[in-house]
Curated annotation (Swiss-Prot):
This is Aminomethyltransferase. Keywords: Aminotransferase, Transferase. PANTHER family: AMINOMETHYLTRANSFERASE (PTHR43757), AMINOMETHYLTRANSFERASE, MITOCHONDRIAL (PTHR43757:SF2). Belongs to the GcvT family. The glycine cleavage system is composed of four proteins: P, T, L and H. It comes from the Bacteria. The lineage of its organism: Bacteria, Pseudomonadati, Pseudomonadota, Gammaproteobacteria, Enterobacterales. Pfam families: GCV_T, GCV_T_C. The keyword Lyase does not apply. HAMAP family: GcvT (MF_00259). GO terms for biological process: glycine decarboxylation via glycine cleavage system. Gene3D superfamilies: Aminomethyltransferase beta-barrel domains, Aminomethyltransferase fragment, Probable tRNA modification gtpase trme, domain 1. The gene is gcvT. It catalyses: N(6)-[(R)-S(8)-aminomethyldihydrolipoyl]-L-lysyl-[protein] + (6S)-5,6,7,8-tetrahydrofolate = N(6)-[(R)-dihydrolipoyl]-L-lysyl-[protein] + (6R)-5,10-methylene-5,6,7,8-tetrahydrofolate + NH4(+). It comes from Enterobacter sp. (strain 638). InterPro entries: GCS_T, GCS_T_bac, GCST_C, GCV_T_N, GcvT/YgfZ/DmdA, GcvT/YgfZ_C, TrmE/GcvT_dom1.
Length: 364
C-alpha cells in the first residue's frame, strides 16, 4: 500500500486527484494543472515534497566523506547554510542520484535526496560512510513544502516569526537556515524564486492551511513536471540514471575536476568519458501543432553527412510558451535543426540550449 505524507488530508480537502508516485500517494493536480502552472510563474504556488528524503550527516570526517562520495566538491561550502547541487555517482560514472547538500558546521551536513531512489541512496551512503565514522540520521520526522513563484517568498514570510523573517532577509539562492522550528532554504525545482521549508510533521497541516489562507495556490505533480522542464531541470530516471554519465545529462558543471588530486567515486570513469566524448543533452522546440513526448526518436545529419539518432528524455506542451518543448539526448555534432518522428509524421524541430524559461521569461 502506498504511503501518505502528513499533508494527505489537506490534499483531499483541496480537491486533489491523488496518484501513486513511487510508492507515495501524491496530488497530480487540484482541478487544473495549467492554472497551477501559471500560478507559480506569475504569483505563488506550493508543492508537498515531503516524499523526498532528508538525511543528516554528523562526524568530524563528514566533509572528507562527502568530498569522496560526491562529484561536486563540498570544499566550496565555507559559509554555514550554503548549499550545492551534485550527482552521486557509481564507479562507472553513472548517476545513482542527484541531490542537494547543505553545510552547517564542520561536523554537520544535510542531504536532500529523491524519493524514488531512497533505499538505494541510503544503502550506498551507509556503505561508504562506515569508513569515515559518519553518523547518518534519516529525518522522517520532517515534512517539506516548496513555495515557488515571484510572490512566494513575500507570501510565505507573512507566516514567519520575527526571528524567521530576520534570518531569511536578503538570503541568496542555495542557502538554508534553521530558524525556530522551520528549516528555510532558497531552493526549488521550478526556475522561480521561492523557499523549500522543512518543519516537524505535526506542524505541516497547519502551515499548509496558513499558506492557502495567504493566497498560495496548491499545485501537483503535473505542474511540477511542466515547470521543471521549462526550467531545463533534470528528472531522475528520465534525463539520467545509473547507466548515464553526468556529462551526457547536462551536469558537467556539477563535476569539480579541481583539485586534480581529489579522489571521488566515478572520477576515473568520467575522465575517460571526457577524453572519448559523450552524447549531449539538448533542448528541442517545436512550434508546429503537436506535442513532443518522452522516448520519441530525434534524427539529424552530422557534418560528415552521416545519419544520427538520439531520443527525447522529457517532452511536454509548455503552458508558458504556448508550444511544445523537450529535452533530448543526442550524439555530438547536432546542428540547429533536427527531425522528430511523431507517429507517421516527420516533424521539424529547432535545437536549443536545454533551458526554456527562467524567472517567468523565455530564454532566448
Amino acid at each position: 500500500m502506498a504511503q501518505q505524507t502528513p499533508l494527505y488530508e489537506q490534499h483531499t480537502l483541496c480537491g486533489a486527484r491523488m496518484v501513486d508516485f513511487h510508492g507515495w500517494m501524491m496530488p497530480l493536480h487540484y482541478g487544473s494543472q495549467i492554472d497551477e502552472h501559471h500560478a507559480v510563474r506569475t504569483d505563488a504556488g506550493m508543492f508537498d515534497v515531503s516524499h523526498m528524503t532528508i538525511v543528516d550527516l554528523r562526524g568530524s570526517r563528514t566533509r572528507e566523506f562527502l568530498r569522496y562520495l560526491l562529484a561536486n566538491d563540498v570544499a566550496k561550502l565555507k559559509t554555514p547554510g550554503k548549499a550545492l547541487y551534485s550527482g552521486m555517482l557509481n564507479a562507472s560514472g553513472g548517476v545513482i542520484d542527484d541531490l542537494i547538500v547543505y553545510y552547517f558546521t564542520e561536523d554537520f551536513f544535510r542531504l536532500v535526496v529523491n524519493s524514488a531512489t531512497r533505499e538505494k541512496d541510503l544503502s550506498w551512503i551507509s556503505q561508504h560512510a562506515e569508513k569515515y565514522a559518519v553518523e547518518i540520521t534519516v529525518r522522517d520526522d520532517l515534512s517539506l513544502i516548496a513555495v515557488q513563484g515571484p510572490n512566494a517568498q513575500a507570501k510565505a514570510a507573512t507566516l514567519f516569526t520575527d526571528e524567521q523573517r530576520h534570518a531569511t532577509e536578503g538570503m541568496k539562492p542555495f542557502f538554508g537556515v534553521q530558524a525556530g522550528d522551520l528549516f528555510i532554504a532558497t531552493t526549488g525545482y521550478t526556475g522561480e524564486a521561492g523557499y523549500e521549508i522543512a518543519m516537524p510533521n505535526e506542524k505541516a497541516a497547519e502551515f499548509w492551511h496558513a499558506l492557502v489562507e495567504a493566497g498560495v495556490k496548491p499545485a501537483g505533480l503535473g505542474a511540477r513536471d511542466t515547470l521543471r522542464l521549462e526550467a531545463g531541470m533534470n528528472l531522475y530516471s528520465q534525463e539520467m540514471d545509473e547507466t548515464v554519465s553526468p556529462l551526457a545529462a547536462n551536469m558537467g558543471w556539477t563535476i569539480a575536476w579541481e583539485p586534480a588530486d581529489r579522489e571521488f567515486i566515478g572520477r576515473e570513469a568520467l575522465e575517460m568519458q571526457r577524453e572519448k566524448g559523450t552524447d549531449q543533452l539538448v533542448g528541442l522546440v517545436m512550434t508546429e501543432k503537436g506535442v513532443l513526448r518522452n522516448e520519441l526518436p530525434v534524427r539529424f545529419t552530422d557534418e560528415l553527412g552521416n545519419q544520427r539518432e538520439g531520443m527525447i528524455t522529457s517532452g511536454t506542451f509548455s503552458p508558458t510558451l504556448g508550444y511544445s518543448i523537450a529535452l533530448a539526448r543526442v550524439p555530438a555534432g547536432i546542428g540547429e535543426t533536427a527531425i522528430v518522428q511523431i507517429r507517421n509524421r516527420e516533424m521539424p524541430v529547432n535545437v536549443t540550449k536545454p533551458i526554456f524559461v527562467r524567472a517567468g521569461k523565455p530564454v532566448a
